Amino acid sequence: MNLIEQIEQEEIKRLTANKTIPPFAPGDTVIVNVNVVEGTRKRVQAYEGVVIAKRNRGLNSSFIVRKISSGEGVERTFQLYSPLLASIEVKRRGDVRRAKLYYLRQRSGKSARIKEKLTFKRKEAAAE
């Protein structure tokens, strides 16, 4: 590990010390709480949508969330380790077979829906 990677790892540890980032993947519906500063006031704004892309680049990791706002598609890119992110909550797991869901940009209505991923418990775990 070179010096730059080591410094980035230390910075990631420092930024995630007071918050936890849940594991999520493209296709998941997430609620991202963002700190918004308006003049002297600071408030938390919730942004809910489907993760259409995730970019894993260490400290520069980011993800794109897409939602439909009053009939218009809105996409927002978030830096994963940004201090402006208050929290991330996974609302629903999506079952997709692609890493980048850019094809959802051309879809609307029912064709833009994503199937929910169902998780089953194993018999050994259920017996205990």
Swiss-Prot record:
UniProt keyword annotations, A-Z: Ribonucleoprotein, Ribosomal protein
PANTHER family: LARGE RIBOSOMAL SUBUNIT PROTEIN BL19M, RIBOSOMAL PROTEIN L19
Known role: This protein is located at the 30S-50S ribosomal subunit interface and may play a role in the structure and function of the aminoacyl-tRNA binding site.
GO biological-process terms attached to the record: translation
Organism of derivation: Ralstonia pickettii (strain 12J)
One function term, GO molecular function aspect: structural constituent of ribosome
UniProt key word Manganese: no
Keyword Ribosomal protein (UniProt): yes
This protein's GO CC annotations: cytosolic large ribosomal subunit
Pfam families: Ribosomal_L19
Family: Belongs to the bacterial ribosomal protein bL19 family.
The protein's name in its UniProt record: Large ribosomal subunit protein bL19
